[in-house]
Amino acid sequence: MKTFLKKEDILKIAELEASLFKERAWTLELIESELENPQNVVIAVEDDFSEIIGYIIAKVILDEAEVLRFGIKKERQGQGIGRGLLRVTLDMLKRKSVKKVFLEVSADNIKAQRLYESFDFKKVGERRGYYSPDKPAFIMCKTLEEGSHVKGRD
């Protein structure tokens, strides 16, 4: 996993973002802007050929964080890459004294919801029409407890 990203890494993240999220994808400029804040957590995962196959961007504000973007290359989903990436991210956020982590997930993305629930994220709200008029997002939250390692249940 890479936490020190070079320009070409950011370009690869933007390309993967575009392939995963189409019209809802963040621009290269938006991704770069999140890298400017040293408190934020941005991690990329590469395969054996230095291709970026996953990434996560979390914004830190005081003792809270929000996972803004999280993507795994389609053909690599279901292989534990997202689980590992989320675990490392939560550990890094904990080291930054973050107490609560929030994220939004599409109501129809059951696989992602199960992943988050395995890390003890709880549904705390809903944003109606967030992804489209008929597609809400669930707001989920996890409390990071001091002195414990982050574990996700399989």
Predicted regions and their residues:
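Conserved hydrophobic beta-strand within the GNAT/NAT acetyltransferase core sheet
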Residues: 67, 101-105
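Acetyl-CoA-dependent GNAT
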Residues: 3-75, 86-88, 92, 96, ...
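Conserved catalytic-core motifs of GNAT/GCN5-like acyltransferases
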Residues: 104, 117, 122-138
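Positions that flank functional sites
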Residues: 32, 108, 131
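Structured catalytic core of nucleotide-sugar glycosyltransferases
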Residues: 58, 92, 112, 124-126
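Conserved acetyl-CoA-binding loop-helix of GNAT-fold acetyltransferases
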Residues: 78-92, 110, 114-118
